[in-house]
């Protein structure tokens, strides 16, 4: 509902999409992940874009686990799995072990939807992400989505979440440079997230070459999340990550929607103010404009990867 009011997109995640939300199709990105939960033709047709999720910034290289206690009622129906059964997402897609395999899935999804939907591929920000992105750009995908280190999740081991992956800024800059060097940057859009916590992070990402950004944890906090870090227990005190009826009632959808609209609207105003201070009057003029950025506390290699100068230069 907030996406509809703001004119932006929201992502279903890997758990499918309940039919009640089909009315928001013009603002929906449907996701196809390794578990393929809830994926069928009507689901693919329900959104404006299809995202193939290969990796996630908070847990590169591993899958996911939704406890059986959360698989009840509509969740069971939407994911198309039995009530009470654990939902296990494998680490890899078992039909994707090469760029050629990825290309086959990309074009299978395009064909299934009449070549009407753009296809995005989401990967985690890791050390070889530039090479991975180069392959994705050649697979026929329309959008490359990069998820950075410190992105949020309710289903990742602490040691993986806190120690695996690289910051989204370094991943974005290296991917943008690699695609430009190979002359294929114009073939795809770059969308980034993972540690996008405020409007300044959005400005930095666009200046480093992103076409768009997405948020998750910031949106949850706007809706009332208090970062209890107990999503996996299924007993969220704020009614967000739970299926317990008494707890679900604590989340007021209308209030959450209004707060999320306020957040994105405020960020939009702040971005305009920062752009005005730079003498830039359009987001297009900011995209890839590294002249607007300076590094503080970064070493020479990091500055080289980012393609920016140190403060004072």
Describe every region a protein language model picked out.
Residues 197-200, 206-312:
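Gly/Ser/Thr/Ala-enriched C-terminal appendages of enzymes
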């Amino acid at each position: 509902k907030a996406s509809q009011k703001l004119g932006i997109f929201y992502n279903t995640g890997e758990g499918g999409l309940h039919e009640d939300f089909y009315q928001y199709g013009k603002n929906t990105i449907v996701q196809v992940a390794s578990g393929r939960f809830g994926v069928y033709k009507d689901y693919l047709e329900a959104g404006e874009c299809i995202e193939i999720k290969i990796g996630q910034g908070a847990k590169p290289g591993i899958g996911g686990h939704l406890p059986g206690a959360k698989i009840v009622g509509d969740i069971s129906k939407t994911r198309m799995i039995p009530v009470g059964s654990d939902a296990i997402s494998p680490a890899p897609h078992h039909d994707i072990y090469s760029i050629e395999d990825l290309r086959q899935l990309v074009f299978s999804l395009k064909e299934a939807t009449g070549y009407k939907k753009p296809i995005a591929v989401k990967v985690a920000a890791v050390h070889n992400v530039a090479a991975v992105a180069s392959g994705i750009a050649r697979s026929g995908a329309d959008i490359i989505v990069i998820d950075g280190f410190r992105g949020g999740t309710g289903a990742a081991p602490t040691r993986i979440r806190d120690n695996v992956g690289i910051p989204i800024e370094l991943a974005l800059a290296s991917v943008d440079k690699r695609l430009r060097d190979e002359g294929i940057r114009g073939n795809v859009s770059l969308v980034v997230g993972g540690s996008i916590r405020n409007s300044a992070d959005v400005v930095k990402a666009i200046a480093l070459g992103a076409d768009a950004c997405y948020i998750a944890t910031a949106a949850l906090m706007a809706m009332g999340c208090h970062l209890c870090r107990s999503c996996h227990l299924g007993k969220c005190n704020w009614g967000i990550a739970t299926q317990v009826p008494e707890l679900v009632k604590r989340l007021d959808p209308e209030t959450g929607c209004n707060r999320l609209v306020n957040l994105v609207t405020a960020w939009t105003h702040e971005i305009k103010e920062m752009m005005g201070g730079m003498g830039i009057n359009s987001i297009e003029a900011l995209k890839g404009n590294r002249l607007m950025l300076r590094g503080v506390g970064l070493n020479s290699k990091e500055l080289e990867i980012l393609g920016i100068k140190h403060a004072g230069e």
